[in-house]
Every structure is written in C-alpha cells, then in structure tokens.
Amino acid sequence: MVSKKIILIAFILVALVQIYVPAKMIVDRAIVLSSGKEFKFKIAPIDPTDPFRGKYISLNFNENSVAIQNKGNWENGETVFVLLTTDSNGFAKIRSVSKVRPLDSQDFLKAKVNYIAYDGSKLFIEYPFDRFYMEESKAYDAELTYNRTLRDTSQVTYALVNIKNGESILKDVMINGIPIKEIVKQEQQNRK
C-alpha cells in the first residue's frame, strides 16, 4: 500500500514537471514579446535561396560586426552579450560586445561569435534570430519578395525583434513598415 502511494506521488511529480517546463518556456517568451524593448535590425542581401533549407527566410543583418582590439580575447562560437542602441533612424546599432552579462538595465542580447576577421580588427556576430519561419503556402513568395526588395535600394527592409534581459524574439520582417506576410498575401490575391 505504501509503495503504491509513493509511485502515485512520484507519477504526479513527474507529470507536474513535464507540464511546468514547457509552460515556463512559453511564458518566458510571451514576457519578452509583451514587455521587451523592440529593435529594428536592418537586413542585408544574402545568397540565393537554398532549396534544402525549408520553409523560412534566411536573414543577414547590416549591423553584425564590431571593431575589436585584441582578437586573442575572442573565440569563434563563444557566447557574447551585444549591447545595443539605436541610430537616428531607429535602427539597432551595436554599442559594444562583452563576455560578461550586463548587470544593469542596459539593452542587450545574447548571441555568439560567428568569426573574427582575418586581420583581427572585427568580430562578427551570429544572432539567434536569423531565420523567419512562415506558413508553407507563403514561404516561397515571401523569399522572392524579400530578395527583390533587398536589391531595390529605395526599399527599407528590416527585422522587428523584441529584446528583454538578453533574450530575443524575431517578431516580424518588415518592408517599408509593412509586415512581409501582408505584402505576400496581397501579392497572392492580386494574381488570382
């Protein structure tokens, strides 16, 4: 009888943990989206689409490097904290990069060192939000629209990212202030 009670209690505890872990992950992301500071990261052109990558737009950012003094202090793939500010147009700018998590209320995000320039003068950053997943029926059209607007210098294309306490969530990809999903939807309706 006692062993059945212990098994029942253990089962309940395991079930609660299995519910708690994904619920906490969802709540943490919802908090970043609802109360995190929004940044606009200007997007740079990338290579043509890779058909093996799946249903997302691969993003590359203009603001992805920072000047460094000593390349020996940095290693490819290591976690870094990117302190951010915004320029006069409201786009994200890297203020500095640190190996230590900032303690004060500065705007920062956790990222990785992508690589260090051959001459050691720049550190390139790999952001955790370099893929924008889309509904399967719209992904291909979105990729075409995205690539077309990047070639047109009169178009302003950027990623809208919410950031709070180092965590970041890619909210949307915008073209001239309009979500890419809406542009693709409109283009698909116009073709009908």
Question: Can you annotate each of these PLM segments?
Answer:
Residues K40-K71:
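Short extracytoplasmic
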Residues D28-V32, D50, N62, S154-V156, ...:
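Extracellular/lumenal and peripheral-membrane lipid-interaction modules
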Residues N64-D119:
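Structured domain cores in non-transmembrane regions
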Residues P45, K55, E63, T86-S88, ...:
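A mature extracytoplasmic/lumenal domain signature
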Residues V21-F41:
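Aromatic-capped interface at the extracytoplasmic side
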Residues R101-K192:
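Soluble extracytoplasmic domains of inner/organellar membrane proteins
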Residues K5-K24:
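Hydrophobic membrane-insertion alpha-helices, especially the h-region
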Residues G36-E38, Y56-S58, G77-T79, S154-Y158:
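Extracytoplasmic
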